[in-house]
């Protein structure tokens, strides 16, 4: 359809469906319509078959409405793929996507298609052609993408659930930013027939809901999983290191999960882990992905390397599928998308093969960690949703922080669910639960079991609006430091790191907190983090002897022997009687004479 229209015009069409009944649709031709929060691109009705006569049970999704991202095929309709040029250059679909058909056949009614990022490639939710959907949770901030409209449709209560596609966070990010549930299933668990591909080795059909029971019911239809008895998790593993660099306090994120777990299953189920260290030890192919190595030690964190692998795979596979169309049409793109697709990209076949090895090894590692009844807990996103029109998504640091967390499930192919936990500083807060590849039904069951208690604990953690703090930030920081010291004495290194991190969040210019956390990192063998913390401590206090000694120790373990000797010597300048610094400096001096 190639007709011109006035800014407020819409087109109503009645077409045959080929599923059941008929559908009526209306295309939004401009971004002027905002009564639907800008979520919908098409209004339509895909009607389910008539309900069976009693005493037969009704269809499992009867009375539920849903929307779909405009990346799924609908018979007789051209999906936009987030860009008007795509619709202009493609023919209408000859059939409806398998996932959509399955849901309609199960009794749900599809009422529309929703806005996606251009070419479904971004995670911001912004679209310069069809408009950026309004985030109902924080209207002055982006909704997250790529499945922005689908998330907004659920968050604004227009539908009971919606479908999106998650490649590198396309469902998980908007769920986190809009404060709703978002499920990314195991890779390959749901049919991709009738979906425009972004990156075939990363793409999954995902879905949003507010109600965990609805999320689960939809999952049972899409996953076609056989019935099994519901099982409680045997282990809930907190990835403590992933929570340490958030701007949200731990008592609003990981501590909420810990308290809910203790209440439901008991303390014995809980386990803490440094996930980066685990990945570094289990995914050997990551070493080949590092461009900066010293004595075999990675200078880039394992999660950042995973993010690089994910970006390379996504870009490589996207170009393999769509490069001809891109070169002919030359579509006008949002800067955040253009920056990723137009920057110079060269990757060898060897690098792609190594990326595939990383993917295989990571899946084995995560499956081995979680087994059949384990759950890994991580933050969904590293930062709150940026303000509309902000430049954060153009920042390499922002992208790296976000994609590092998102790469875990994308690369391993494991299933992940975003769980909202209220608000902090007026922005939605969420965590994510990950289960092994193929553990989708178990994860949906676990979410349903935990959801109410998680919300209760999140409410308890949120301060009352009428309450006033009677303890200063500095005092609270000191309390956290003392708790960290006690945990360190008890040889609970990861727990100590958590408390020192809390102290740093409350008072970020105290050298002692960084130096103490560095010592705990040394005990865990996390030498890069220890070196970084010591350097920060020294920047605040250039006479901090312990920081110099601890940095020297970290550098020695990393193989930076000259720098280590310099640190030990400077510690002796500050404290000539320091026997440990003297012996360390002498040992290295003799070694390299």
UniProtKB/Swiss-Prot annotation:
TM regions (residue ranges): 5-25, 145-165, 404-424
Could you state one GO biological process linked to this protein?
Answer: protein transport
- Coiled-coil spans in chain: none
Q: SMART domains of this UniProt entry?
A: TPR
Q: How does it sit in the membrane?
A: Multi-pass membrane protein
Side Chloroplast intermembrane, residues: 1-4, 166-403
GO cellular component term, pick one: chloroplast outer membrane
Where is it predominantly found? plastid
What PROSITE patterns is this protein classified in? TPR, TPR_REGION
Q: Where are the TPR repeats?
A: 477-510, 511-544, 545-578
Where is it localised? Plastid, Chloroplast outer membrane
Q: What is the effect of changing residue 550 to A?
A: 80% decrease of HSP70 and HSP90 binding
* Classification via InterPro entries: Amidase_dom, AS_sf, TPR-like_helical_dom_sf, TPR_2, TPR_rpt
Q: Name one Pfam family in it.
A: TPR_2
Q: Which residues lie on this side of the membrane: Cytoplasmic?
A: 26-144, 425-593
**Taxonomy, superkingdom:** Eukaryota
Functional summary from the UniProt entry: Chaperone receptor mediating Hsp90-dependent protein targeting to chloroplasts. Bi-functional preprotein receptor acting on both sides of the membrane.
* Assembly and binders: Part of the Toc complex and of the intermembrane space complex. Interacts with TOC12, TIC22 and with the cytosolic domain of TOC34 in a GTP dependent manner. Interacts (via TPR region) with HSP90 and with HSP70 with low efficiency.
Could you give the domain comment from the record?
A: The TPR region (477-578) is not required for assembly into the Toc complex, but interacts with TOC34 only while transferring the preprotein from HSP90 to the Toc core translocon. The amidase region (166-200) is required for the efficient transfer of the preprotein.
Q: Under what name is this protein listed?
A: Translocon at the outer membrane of chloroplasts 64
Q: Which organism is it from?
A: Pisum sativum
């Amino acid at each position: 359809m190639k007709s011109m229209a006035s800014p407020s015009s819409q087109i109503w069409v009645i077409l045959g469906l080929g599923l059941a009944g008929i559908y009526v649709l209306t295309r939004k031709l401009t971004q002027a319509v905002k009564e639907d929060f800008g979520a919908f691109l098409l209004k339509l009705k895909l009607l389910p078959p008539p309900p069976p006569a009693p005493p037969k049970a009704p269809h499992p999704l009867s009375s539920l409405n849903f929307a779909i991202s405009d990346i799924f095929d609908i018979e007789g309709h051209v999906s936009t793929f987030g860009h008007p040029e795509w619709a202009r250059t493609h023919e209408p679909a000859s059939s409806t996507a398998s996932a959509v058909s399955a849901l309609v056949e199960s009794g749900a009614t599809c009422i529309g298609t929703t806005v996606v990022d251009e070419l479904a490639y971004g995670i911001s939710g912004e679209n310069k052609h069809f408009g950026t959907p309004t985030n109902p949770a924080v209207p002055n901030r982006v909704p997250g993408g790529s499945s922005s409209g689908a998330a907004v449709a659920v968050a604004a209560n227009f539908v009971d659930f919606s479908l999106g596609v998650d490649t590198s966070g396309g469902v998980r990010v908007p769920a986190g930013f809009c404060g709703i549930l978002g499920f990314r299933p195991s890779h390959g668990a749901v049919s991709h027939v009738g979906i425009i591909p972004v990156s075939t080795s990363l793409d999954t059909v995902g879905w949003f809901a507010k109600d965990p029971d609805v999320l689960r019911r939809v999952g049972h239809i899409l996953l076609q999983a056989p019935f099994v008895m519901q099982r409680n998790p045997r282990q809930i593993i907190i990835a403590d290191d992933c929570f340490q660099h958030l701007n949200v306090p731990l008592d609003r994120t990981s501590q909420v999960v810990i308290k809910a777990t203790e209440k439901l299953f008991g303390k014995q189920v809980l386990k803490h882990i440094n996930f980066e260290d685990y990945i570094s030890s289990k995914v050997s192919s990551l070493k080949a992905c590092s461009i900066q190595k010293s004595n075999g030690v990675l200078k880039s964190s394992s999660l950042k390397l995973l993010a690089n692998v994910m970006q390379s795979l996504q870009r490589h596979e996207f170009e393999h599928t769509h490069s001809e169309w891109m070169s002919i049409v030359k579509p006008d793109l949002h800067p955040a998308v253009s920056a990723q697709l137009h920057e110079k990209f060269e990757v060898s076949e060897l690098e792609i093969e190594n990326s595939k090895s990383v993917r295989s090894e990571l899946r084995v590692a995560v499956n081995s960690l979680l087994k059949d009844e384990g759950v890994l807990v991580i933050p969904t996103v590293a930062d709150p949703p940026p303000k509309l029109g902000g430049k954060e998504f153009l920042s390499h640091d922002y992208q790296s922080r976000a994609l590092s967390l998102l790469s875990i499930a994308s690369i391993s192919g494991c299933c992940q669910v975003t769980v909202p936990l209220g608000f902090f500083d007026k922005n939605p807060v969420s965590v994510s639960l990950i289960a092994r590849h193929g553990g989708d039904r178990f994860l949906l069951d676990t979410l349903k079991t935990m959801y109410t208690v998680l919300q209760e604990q999140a409410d308890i953690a949120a301060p009352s609006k009428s309450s006033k703090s009677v303890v200063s930030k500095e005092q609270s920081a000191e309390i956290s430091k003392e708790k960290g010291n006690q945990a360190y004495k008890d040889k609970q290194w990861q727990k100590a790191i958590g408390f020192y991190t809390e102290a740093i969040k409350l008072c970020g210019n105290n050298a002692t907190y960084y130096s103490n956390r560095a010592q705990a990192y040394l005990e865990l063998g996390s030498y890069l983090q220890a070196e970084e913390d010591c350097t920060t401590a020294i920047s605040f206090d250039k006479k901090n002897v312990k920081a110099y000694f601890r940095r020297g120790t970290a550098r020695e373990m990393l193989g930076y022997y000259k720098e280590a000797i310099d640190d030990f010597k400077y510690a002796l300048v500050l404290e000539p009687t320091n026997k440990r610094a003297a012996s360390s400096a002498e040992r290295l001096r003799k070694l390299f004479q």
